[in-house]
Curated annotation (Swiss-Prot):
<dbReference type="GO" id="GO:0009252">
    <property type="term" value="P:peptidoglycan biosynthetic process"/>
</dbReference>
<feature type="transmembrane region" description="Helical">
    <location>
        <begin position="263"/>
        <end position="283"/>
    </location>
</feature>
<keyword id="KW-0472">Membrane</keyword>
<keyword id="KW-0812">Transmembrane</keyword>
<keyword id="KW-0131">Cell cycle</keyword>
<keyword id="KW-0808">Transferase</keyword>
<feature type="transmembrane region" description="Helical">
    <location>
        <begin position="132"/>
        <end position="152"/>
    </location>
</feature>
<feature type="transmembrane region" description="Helical">
    <location>
        <begin position="73"/>
        <end position="93"/>
    </location>
</feature>
<keyword id="KW-0479">Metal-binding</keyword>
<feature type="transmembrane region" description="Helical">
    <location>
        <begin position="288"/>
        <end position="308"/>
    </location>
</feature>
<keyword id="KW-1003">Cell membrane</keyword>
<feature type="transmembrane region" description="Helical">
    <location>
        <begin position="199"/>
        <end position="219"/>
    </location>
</feature>
<feature type="transmembrane region" description="Helical">
    <location>
        <begin position="21"/>
        <end position="41"/>
    </location>
</feature>
<keyword id="KW-0133">Cell shape</keyword>
<dbReference type="Pfam" id="PF10555">
    <property type="entry name" value="MraY_sig1"/>
</dbReference>
<comment type="similarity">
    <text>Belongs to the glycosyltransferase 4 family. MraY subfamily.</text>
</comment>
<keyword id="KW-0573">Peptidoglycan synthesis</keyword>
Length: 360
């Protein structure tokens, strides 16, 4: 929004052209989201307490979690608000990739809000009925995906990029829709599963979003994309603004979500952030890289799949409890130790993912 205003003001003072610089806007997008979060946070936490929007806790979970019962939840509303405001302020709103990303973020946020509200209203951890939850997640993602496919059909925007192989970039055709669907919905649910400890999900999200800011910049630059043997995609550079807004909002939320948490993001935050990361990965054509950089999310999801599969087939559990972060809690690890070690793993995977851009 401010890009258009600055262009108008340039005729009166040339210094306003600094707003057109992507690096300038990306830093301000991060700072705007961060400072807004720090300002809004205490007010939102008080409101959530007044409305009695408290977290429900599983009765079969670790005993240390019982003290979390009643902690304000749905703090993800703060994350969504600050990301949206920051992106609208500093992004080029003529860029369709900005709107695809915001659509999934807010659409998934709305689904998460209903899910959280039902948990609070009925005082259980069930939320939305699973089939309806996946119906709405699927509908939102498919609307965005078909728009993305129509915009980039038969161009580099619908090619498959395979890490380590610079010559393998097949045109996906309609399989793009299938792949994008599983990436967006899958990532959304993976982040949701990871969000079980104070700050556990938000910091890996910040790491991955920060890395995608770099990748979006490279993909939207003709020379850099050519140098790295990745496809040049016209609209991706503006995703840097969206990614840095996520980083700022995430760090601002972590201020209140760090152990012991004053507020939880709830499904309104985790489903939305996961959907946003999946959408970014699809738009910059780095779905495989998301699997690497989001390895903590993958690990959490796989642990649940293995646990459920093992119990159904053998009537035995592999882990003491799934997702796997609860397994380590039940082994006696203090919650902060689990969180920090998972953060370290996430950072290592993100750095390795960035290195693979050159290993081709």
């Amino acid at each position: 929004m401010l890009v258009w205003f600055a262009k108008f003001l340039e005729q009166y003072y040339s210094g306003f052209n600094v707003v057109s610089y992507l690096t300038f806007r990306s830093v301000l997008a991060l700072l705007t989201a961060l400072l807004l979060s720090l300002w809004i946070g205490p007010k939102m936490i008080r409101r959530l307490q007044i409305f009695k929007f408290g977290q429900e806790v599983r009765n079969d979970g670790p005993e240390s979690h019982f003290q979390k019962r009643g902690t304000p939840t749905m703090g993800g509303l703060m994350i969504l608000a600050t990301i949206t405001v920051s992106t609208l302020l500093w992004g080029d709103l003529s860029n369709p990739y900005i709107w695809f990303s915001l659509f999934v973020l807010l659409g998934y946020g709305a689904i998460g809000f209903v899910d959280d509200y039902r948990k609070i209203k009925y005082k259980n951890t069930d939320g939305l009925i699973a089939r309806w939850k996946y119906f709405w997640l699927s509908l939102v993602s498919l609307i965005a995906i078909f728009g993305m496919y129509a915009l980039g059909k038969d161009t580099d925007a619908t090619r498959l990029v395979v890490p380590f192989f610079k010559e393998i970039m097949p045109q996906l055709g309609l399989f793009y829709v299938v792949l994008a669907y599983f990436v967006i919905v899958g990532t959304s649910n993976a982040v949701n599963l990871t969000d079980g400890l104070d700050g556990l999900a938000i910091m890996p999200t910040v790491f991955v979003a920060g890395a995608f800011a770099i990748i979006a910049w490279a993909t939207g630059n003709v020379e850099i994309s050519k140098y790295l043997y990745i496809p040049y995609i016209k609209y991706t550079s503006e995703l840097v603004i969206f990614c840095t807004a996520i980083v700022g909002a995430g760090l601002g939320f972590l201020w209140f979500n760090t152990y012991p948490a004053q507020v939880f993001m709830g499904d309104v935050g985790s489903l939305a952030l996961g959907g946003a990361l999946g959408t970014i990965a699809v738009l910059v054509r780095q779905e495989f890289l998301l699997v690497i950089m989001g390895g903590v999310f993958v690990m959490e999801t796989v642990s649940v799949i293995l646990q459920v599969g093992s119990y159904k087939l053998r009537k035995k559990r592999i882990f003491r409890m799934a997702p796997i972060h609860h397994h380590y809690e039940l082994k006696g690890w203090p919650e902060p130790r689990v969180i920090i070690r998972f953060w370290i793993i996430s950072l290592m995977l993100v750095l390795f993912g960035l290195v693979t851009l050159k290993l081709r």
